Amino acid sequence: TSHGVFLEPPAFGVVIGEPLADPTTAVLDDGRIRLYAYAQGIGIVSAVSDNGLTFTEEPGVRIPGIEAGQPRVWRLPDGRWRLYVSKMMEIASFTSEDGLIFTKDSGNRLTAEAAGLPAISSPAIVEVESGRWRMYYSTLAIPGAGPGGKRSGSATSTDLLTWTVDPGWRLGEGAPYLTDSAEHPFPVLDEDGTVSLFYGKFRASPGGAPDGLYRAISADGLTFTEEAYTGLYFGNDPEVLRLPTGNRIVYYGDFDPAIGG
């Protein structure tokens, strides 16, 4: 079921035609939904909702300027909030007590060099077992570079700060099965222990599968053997949230030159 457009320029002061993109969400202790997004020329901003469908902008900027892009929020075991962000050549992070005021963590979480990529983006995390987490990431989609040629990898951590790259590739060139371009991966741990990875597939040549949002499935979170088109044409930057009702909602980005992201 489509719920339409939630946020678009001129929300948060974004200029018409510019991106308001990369949504990431979390359920707060009071049951509300907070959505963070990248606002072109402004930084990482946030909005809140009682039902996950109608959002009210929150004042201020969570992370200003060009310090961060493509955010992913994660609730730490101690209750604090962390935003993992893309900085082209590295993934960095910012931590907050209240989800509103963030302080940059020292160092980086993972570099593009360590991941074997020319540039890195879209960190997204799932807890694979108690005290062990896996981060998925992909090649950074650079404006003007054209579609195709993206691949997704992963890394693991026991403290959510230091990440070790998993051997091989999950999706894209070099992966054992699903070798089409794949970007902006987002993992969902299903009740049976399988991992569903949602991602954007945009081909460099016409024909074949349609462009848009796909879902791949893996028994171990490392080898993905099956994929299916979600029907969301040209959808990208997915975030899947389980609402307090138990339903799941997919937030994703789109772009219209007359409007923006």
What is the predicted function of each stretch?
Residues 1-261:
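Carbohydrate-active catalytic/glycan-binding domains of CAZyme proteins
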